[in-house]
Regions:
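A short, acidic/glycine-rich surface segment
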Residues: 27-35, 72-73
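Residues that flank catalytic or metal-binding motifs in active/ligand-binding sites
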Residues: 9, 16-18, 40-45, 84
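Short glycine-/small-residue motifs
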Residues: 98
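Vicinal oxygen chelate
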Residues: 42-95
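Conserved catalytic-core motifs of GNAT/GCN5-like acyltransferases
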Residues: 1-6, 74-77, 103
Length: 104
């Protein structure tokens, strides 16, 4: 176990270089996501792909050329620390994070 935050209802597990967040739908974080899995809700907040090298402007431009709207680039925490990332939606409405290397 990487980290446990009972106040948030969060357990983080490490698998190699990846970090997996387990959040019960009844906890503080989970209930903020809406209904439990089914027709009205999903069981996934987002998944992440590591992108290196990470050029936010080039990524946003490439996505726009394919009709994909990207969220604003921002520094976010991840499995290896804080680094740049961009959120997009896949064709089924799942949130995908494109994550760059950590910032020193």
């Amino acid at each position: 176990m990487e980290e446990r935050r009972d106040d948030l209802g969060l357990i983080q597990l490490r698998a190699g270089k990846s970090l997996l967040d387990l959040v019960p739908v009844t906890g503080k974080l989970g209930s903020a996501g809406g209904a439990a899995p089914g027709k009205e809700g999903r069981n996934l907040d987002h998944f992440c792909f590591r992108v290196e090298p990470f050029d936010a402007a080039a990524i946003v431009k490439q996505l726009a050329q394919h009709g994909i709207e990207a969220g604003a680039p921002a520094a976010r925490n991840g499995a290896e620390g804080v680094g740049p990332s961009i959120y997009v939606l896949d064709p089924e409405g799942n949130v995908v994070e494109l994550k760059g290397p950590i910032q020193n």
